[in-house]
């Protein structure tokens, strides 16, 4: 990915700290939890942290936040590594795992206990919520166990580690400020018991640090200077600062927040996405309708289009909802320049050229990319024979008003080949047209009639003899509701699924040159849109985006 230079409120903060000599190296990180696949919203966090580090000649870490073993696994680790590699976001500061710091986190927890800044609590989760009060005016009250001595707390905490207690029987809480208006500062839990096998540590641990405790410690150990995260962590910043100040006695790392990327007609919640996968509503985490990076990759999106979209969506502290069509517009502009042109007939009907010899096959040179900005003059040979496939929608026996393509007695151009005039049709017993007949003007090999007559319509075609069969998937938005964050709290998000989010075209006919196409190749199917071979199902093509859209950036 090319270096990006930009200015926003985050770079303003960094510029000020650099100018005052508070930091020497800008060091950022991206800390995904390996319990699901990354999505388009994750791309914003990657873009910000990676690009800011690159902009300042600094370091960018990838750290797997695997401190909660319940749903984490190596499948997700590998998918995240693949996504960052695909995006070109090289973690030049290193790849780390939060679980590698478990021993250090434990030692820091004991330090807080010895200093009287943490205690073991026996309250249940429900009791703890009751004792903490709320931010609507209900005051908190201290746990009956808040004044245990450091010696008693150390003994209990070590027994927690030894596995003496059941899940939820005890927690370790930071002793901060029960009167704080910020609920996160009212003696937050920093360790809990979970007798769950960890995907990397096995059964070595049965107590695990909470994110709000582990995260600042990990940042400090790695030398992170700016912990840039999404806006939902803003109220957690005082706790982040408390941990850094009490354990490391310094100002940095510094946490700052930005607004999440919300996109129309989809969901970003891992819980919702996992439900779609586990209930087989979609074809896995990489279903081309999903907002996951693996789904977008399988659909045919490019890393450049995703980072360009994120940049154009803006970096601010104000939440906004970005139209998915903006991403499509960015990609469409890229593919218009870069995608090779090919011919595909999605809904075929046979066109028989009656005056063309049955044993004849001509090769016509069609342009690979006629876009003038590209200056690509290369061509490819396409076979022309007596029997061709054309789009069913390009012929009407009784045409609608202003129809300019093939009808009985009318003449059209066969793209890059001859002019043909329709002479008749074949029908089945039900009266359906099954084949169209025409005569070619064999003097118009270049499409230009000698008498200068005007022919307004041009249609595409492939040879029946020289083509390949394919299944084509035409994708639309996954949900009918534009803003899925606005649905009622008691609503089932699945009720908003779009029943027409995918249409399967089973018997498309593609030009023969596509037999060597590979997943990751992208083509413009002339007049039909942009397509790519599916990475899971051989012989299937996915529509990436349509040729045009009314959306304006």
Label every PLM stretch briefly.
Residues 6-15, 19-82, 197-230:
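N-terminal catalytic cores of NTP/NDP-binding nucleotidyl/phosphoryl-transfer enzymes
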Residues 66-68, 74, 111-273, 331, ...:
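Active-site cores that bind ATP or allylic diphosphates and position pyrophosphate for catalysis
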Residues 233-237, 241-243, 311-314, 321-553:
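Core subunits and conserved enzymes of cellular information-processing
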Residues 76-103, 108-109, 116-119:
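A glycine-rich helix N-cap at a beta->alpha junction
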Residues 19-22, 51-59, 85-92, 220, ...:
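Secondary-structure transition/capping motifs at alpha-helix termini
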Residues 31-35, 63-71, 94-103, 126, ...:
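Conserved short loop/turn motifs at secondary-structure junctions
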Residues 253-330:
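Long, charged, mostly alpha-helical binding arms that flank functional sites
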């Amino acid at each position: 990915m090319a270096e990006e230079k930009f200015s926003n409120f985050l770079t303003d903060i960094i510029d000020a700290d650099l100018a005052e000599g508070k930091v020497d190296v800008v060091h950022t990180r991206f800390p995904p939890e390996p319990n699901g696949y990354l999505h388009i919203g994750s791309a914003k966090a990657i873009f910000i942290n990676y690009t800011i580090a690159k902009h300042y000649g600094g370091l960018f870490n990838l750290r797997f936040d695997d401190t909660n073993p319940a749903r984490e696994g190596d499948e997700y680790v590998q998918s995240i590594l693949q996504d960052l590699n695909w995006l070109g976001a090289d973690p030049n500061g290193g790849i780390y795992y939060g679980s590698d710091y478990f021993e250090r986190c434990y030692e820091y927890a004991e330090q807080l206990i010895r200093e009287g800044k943490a205690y073991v609590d026996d309250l249940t989760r429900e009791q703890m919520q009751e004792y903490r009060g709320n931010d609507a005016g209900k005051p908190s009250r201290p746990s009956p166990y808040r004044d245990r001595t450091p010696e008693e707390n150390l003994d209990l905490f070590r027994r927690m580690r030894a596995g003496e207690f059941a899940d939820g029987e005890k927690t370790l809480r930071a002793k901060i400020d029960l009167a704080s208006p910020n609920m996160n500062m009212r003696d937050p839990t920093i360790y809990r018991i979970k007798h769950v096998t960890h995907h990397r540590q096995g059964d070595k641990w049965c107590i695990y640090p909470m994110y709000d405790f582990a995260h600042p410690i990990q940042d400090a150990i790695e030398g992170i200077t700016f912990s840039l995260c999404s806006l939902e962590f803003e109220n957690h910043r005082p706790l982040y600062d408390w941990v850094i100040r009490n354990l490391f006695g310094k100002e940095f790392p510094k946490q700052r927040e930005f607004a999440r990327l919300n996109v129309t007609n989809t969901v970003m919640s891992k819980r919702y996405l996992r439900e779609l996968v586990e209930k087989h509503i979609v074809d896995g985490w990489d279903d081309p309708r999903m907002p996951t990076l693996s789904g977008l990759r399988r659909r045919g999106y490019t890393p450049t289009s995703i980072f360009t979209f994120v940049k154009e969506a803006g970096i601010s502290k104000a939440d906004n909802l970005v139209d998915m069509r903006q991403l499509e517009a960015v990609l469409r502009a890229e593919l218009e320049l870069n995608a090779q042109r090919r011919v595909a007939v999605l809904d075929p009907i046979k066109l028989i050229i009656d005056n063309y010899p049955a044993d004849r096959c001509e090769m016509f040179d069609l342009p690979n990319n006629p876009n003038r900005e590209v200056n690509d003059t290369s061509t490819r040979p396409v076979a022309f024979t007596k029997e061709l496939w054309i789009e069913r929608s390009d012929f009407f026996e009784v045409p609608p008003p202003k129809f300019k393509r093939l009808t009985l007695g009318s003449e059209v151009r066969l793209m890059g080949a001859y002019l043909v005039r329709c002479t008749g049709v074949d029908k089945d017993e039900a009266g359906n047209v099954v084949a169209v007949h025409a005569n070619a003007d064999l003097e118009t090999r270049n499409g230009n009639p000698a008498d200068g007559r005007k022919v307004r319509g041009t249609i595409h075609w492939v040879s029946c003899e020289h083509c390949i069969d394919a299944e084509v998937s035409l994708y639309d938005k996954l949900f009918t509701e534009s803003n899925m964050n606005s649905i009622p709290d008691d609503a089932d998000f699945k009720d908003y699924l779009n029943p027409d989010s995918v249409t399967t075209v089973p018997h498309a006919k593609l030009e023969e040159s596509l037999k060597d196409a590979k997943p990751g190749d992208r083509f413009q199917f002339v007049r039909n849109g942009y397509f790519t071979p599916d990475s899971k199902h051989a012989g299937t093509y996915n529509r990436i985006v349509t040729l045009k859209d009314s959306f304006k950036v």
